Curated annotation (Swiss-Prot):
Its main location: cytoplasm. InterPro entries: aa-tRNA-synth_I_cd-bd, aa-tRNA-synth_I_codon-bd_sub2, aa-tRNA-synth_I_CS, aa_tRNA-synth_I_cd-bd_sf, Glu-tRNA-ligase_bac/mito, Glu/Gln-tRNA-synth, Glu/Gln-tRNA-synth_Ib_cat-dom, GluQ/Sye. Its EC number is 6.1.1.17. The gene is gltX. This is Glutamate--tRNA ligase. ATP binds at residue 254. One of its GO terms (molecular function) is zinc ion binding. Its cofactor is Zn(2+). HAMAP family: Glu_tRNA_synth_type1 (MF_00022). Keywords: Aminoacyl-tRNA synthetase, ATP-binding, Cytoplasm, Ligase, Metal-binding, Nucleotide-binding, Protein biosynthesis, Zinc. It comes from Pseudomonas paraeruginosa (strain DSM 24068 / PA7). A motif ('KMSKS' region) lies at residues 251-255. One of its GO terms (biological process) is glutamyl-tRNA aminoacylation. Monomer. It is found in: Cytoplasm.
Length: 494
């Protein structure tokens, strides 16, 4: 019998996401329940955004949760390399094969031409898609232009009529019309593959038998299915998991909920409690119990118990469940976990340089730096009273800063400062006009250690979480204000 092999393939482009852990958990449970193997693969073909630091954070975050893998970049295995950036020659081979067989073609269209074509299609109220301009170029012309160094990509051919039947383990057969599909780029101009080619090639060569991924990928499934057909390969069984959602039913996003695994670690949640909560996202134990271990989930795992209704990621329910785990610990276990969380040597070393020069004895540390060890901070609206700005302007500044920080990819002091500076300058303010608002929002005090250093240490999700708390305290933004301020946000450079 074929060994079940599943995988998770995150992109190392930012903080490790709870959605990644959610999909990893279900892939792990499915594999283990069937006596199979679970593989971790890194999708780092976005060279501008991918970093090894983010990759390591993914490893650390998943391991903190208790998720282990059988093969991967850090543990090796017989199907490596496990980083897509190290497999370029493999993708090139299969891309060329598709072109030779007439299933794909070389496209020289410039971004400007593509934008113009799409604009015309949208003006005619047509679905924007590639118009096939380069699909029938003579072979000698293609060779000549490639040899001359002209920028090009490889696109796959897709049917324009009929439907593709997508066999989904949760929904049964799903029919998707081919006229919704574009002629997908397979190899980019930089010589690296897109998601579609890399996933199909890697899943085949790594012997993946079952693919559990988020349902946001279901509409593009026909492209993957067609690639398997073109290559003549057996297709893995497909399962499209329901998306995690905010309490308002929108897709889970950092704008409405902290999404970073490291945020929950910093907040003092137990890893087994967070994993337990993710396991309850759209799935339930046969006896409906709410608290269970990873081993118990694996033992009873059955995809038929997955609910297609979008599971709500609710911070209050997670906190309640975490409390259940805490209260069932022995006093010794509780003390060990608190010590591990509060006295983490690596974290203390980040804080120490900012505190050491400001205290005369250790008893002064807690009042000065206690905000480093809490989730939210006690807020006093009077701390946001400003000599130069009225209450509406105060809320506007905080909202604009929050929005700019939400778009920040690399959480570093210089970039954080740049975001705040950009907001200040656009509003014709000075940085010193804005910083008095940042101190109470982030630290709970009118003054403290450098708030910019503090934000870098606290991390993106926790800093943004506290800014949201401050905005809520001050009344938030009305719908009218939100629309007006979004226009201002979009005009801010950077």
């Amino acid at each position: 019998m074929t060994t079940v092999r599943t995988r998770i393939a995150p992109s190392p482009t930012g903080d490790p996401h709870v959605g990644t852990a959610y999909i990893a958990l279900f892939n792990l449970c499915f594999a283990r329940q069937h006596g199979g193997q679970f593989i971790l693969r890194i999708e780092d073909t976005d060279q501008l955004r991918s970093t090894r630091e983010s990759e390591q954070q993914i490893f650390d975050a998943l391991r903190w949760l208790g998720i282990e893998w059988d093969e991967g970049p850090d543990v090796g295995g017989p199907h490596g390399p496990y980083r897509q950036s190290e497999r370029g020659h493999i993708y090139k081979k299969y891309s060329d094969e598709l072109v030779e067989q007439g299933h794909a073609f070389t496209c020289f269209c410039t971004p400007e031409r593509l934008d113009a074509v799409r604009a015309e299609q949208m003006a005619r109220k047509e679905t924007p898609r590639y118009d096939g301009h380069c699909m029938h170029l003579p072979k000698d012309e293609v060779q000549r232009r490639v040899a001359a160094g002209e920028s090009h990509v490889t696109r796959m051919k897709v049917p324009t009529e009929g439907v593709c039947v997508v066999p989904d383990m949760l929904r049964g057969n799903v029919e998707i019309p081919w006229d919704r599909m574009d002629m997908q780029v397979l190899m980019k101009a930089d010589g690296l593959p897109t998601y579609f080619l890399a996933n199909v090639v890697d899943d085949h060569l790594m012997g993946i038998t079952h693919v559990l991924r988020g349902e946001e990928w279901l509409p593009s499934a026909p492209k993957l299915i067609k690639l398997y057909e073109y290559f003549g390969w057996e297709q893995p069984q497909l399962c499209y998991m329901p998306l995690l959602r905010n309490p308002d039913k929108s897709k889970l996003s950092k704008r409405k909920n902290p999404t970073s695994i490291t945020f929950y670690e910093r907040m003092g949640y137990l890893p087994q409690a967070l994993l337990n909560y993710l396991g309850r996202m759209g799935w339930s134990m046969p006896d409906e119990r709410e608290k269970f271990t990873l081993a118990e989930m694996i033992e009873h795992f059955d995809l038929s118990r997955v609910s297609l209704g979008g599971p709500i990621f609710d911070l209050e329910k997670l906190s309640w469940l975490n409390g259940q785990w805490i209260r069932e610990q022995s006093v010794e276990e509780f003390a060990r976990e608190v010590q591990k969380w509060a006295l983490n040597p690596e974290y203390l070393m980040k804080i120490a340089p900012h505190v050491q020069g400001r205290v005369e004895n250790f008893s002064q540390i807690a009042p000065l730096a206690g905000f480093f060890f809490s989730g939210g901070v006690p807020l006093d609206a009077s701390l946001f009273e400003h000599k130069k700005l009225d209450p509406t302007q105060v809320r506007q500044v905080l909202q604009l800063v929050l929005w700019k920080l939400e778009s920040l990819r690399q959480w570093e002091k210089e970039r954080i400062t740049g975001c705040i500076q950009a907001v200040a300058e656009h509003l014709q303010l000075k940085l010193r006009d804005v910083m008095p608002l940042m101190f109470p929002a982030i630290t709970g005090h009118a003054s403290s250690v450098s708030v910019l250093d503090a934000m870098e240490i606290l991390g993106a999700d926790l800093s943004r979480y506290r800014l949201r708390q401050a905005l809520e305290l001050l009344g938030g933004a009305s719908k009218k204000e939100t629309k007006e301020w979004e226009k201002i946000r979009d005009a801010i450079p950077g």
